[in-house]
């Protein structure tokens, strides 16, 4: 049986956004989005969902390493975070007076873009 394709949802965060994790073992952690994977609706957040990877030595005489790196989490488990108000909020999309579409935090009304 063939593997099912993941359902694509629109991702509400972009690279460089500050987000707070709202579910999982790192709940409450605030970090910066390093990378977004829109096809699988996943994001890579700095300092969240850390995994240890054992790397074999590549050349003779070189020693192996244990590397700690971030693993991706689903975008539904993060909310945009306001650094000024210190609160996480859902996102609303609105238009400015000049016609640009911008993201706005629902709790504070702060415009992100």
Curated annotation (Swiss-Prot):
GO BP terms in the entry: translation
Keywords of this entry: Ribonucleoprotein, Ribosomal protein, RNA-binding, rRNA-binding
Domain of life the protein comes from: Bacteria
One GO CC term, this protein: ribosome
Record's keyword annotation contains Ribosomal protein: yes
InterPro entries (UniProt xref): KOW, Rib_uL2_dom2, Ribosomal_uL24, Ribosomal_uL24_CS, Ribosomal_uL24_KOW, Translation_prot_SH3-like_sf
Subunit structure and binding partners: Part of the 50S ribosomal subunit.
Name of the protein in its database record: Large ribosomal subunit protein uL24
Gene: rplX
């Amino acid at each position: 049986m063939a593997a099912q394709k993941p359902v694509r949802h629109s991702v509400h965060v972009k690279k460089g956004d500050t987000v707070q994790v709202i579910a999982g073992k790192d709940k409450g952690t605030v970090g910066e989005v390093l990378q977004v994977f829109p096809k699988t609706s996943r994001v890579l957040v700095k300092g969240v969902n850390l995994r240890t990877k054992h790397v074999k030595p590549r050349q003779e005489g070189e020693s192996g390493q244990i590397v700690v790196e971030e693993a991706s989490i689903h975008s539904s488990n993060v909310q945009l975070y306001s650094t000024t108000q210190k609160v996480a909020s859902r996102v609303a999309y609105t238009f400015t007076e000049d016609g640009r579409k911008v993201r706005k935090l629902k709790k504070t009304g702060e415009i992100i873009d």
